[in-house]
């Protein structure tokens, strides 16, 4: 018997919608990353993108535990000398709530071309509306 290897052209990808309202950021991000990679499927193959599309709604209502709302700091660099910028979790949620979930999930995906392809299947929205009704996404309860 030969070992099964998934082929990119035969992978069936489903669309799922997840409501982030009241969910803990890290626990939500790990399950999203797992499904983007395709590890929940029997035909998972490490070197093939077998994951599904994930739509995340209500990113502005995601929860964190402890004092992370005020103490957690996100760093980024402009590329210029002395150009390090920082923002707390509260500031990030106020400015662009989608980025909080995107950063958390991206850090859990593989680094490289395959990881970037998986990341492109993540769609995050601050509110409860999305424009992917044509894909008929199924509700995923995490």
UniProtKB/Swiss-Prot annotation:
The keyword Cytoplasm does not apply. Gene3D superfamilies: Ribosomal protein L13. Keywords: Ribonucleoprotein, Ribosomal protein. InterPro entries: Ribosomal_uL13, Ribosomal_uL13_bac-type, Ribosomal_uL13_CS, Ribosomal_uL13_sf. It comes from the Bacteria. GO terms for molecular function: mRNA binding; structural constituent of ribosome. One of its GO terms (cellular component) is cytosolic large ribosomal subunit. The keyword Ribonucleoprotein applies. GO terms for biological process: negative regulation of translation; translation. This protein is one of the early assembly proteins of the 50S ribosomal subunit, although it is not seen to bind rRNA by itself. It is important during the early stages of 50S assembly. Belongs to the universal ribosomal protein uL13 family. Part of the 50S ribosomal subunit. This is Large ribosomal subunit protein uL13. It comes from Proteus mirabilis (strain HI4320). The gene is rplM.
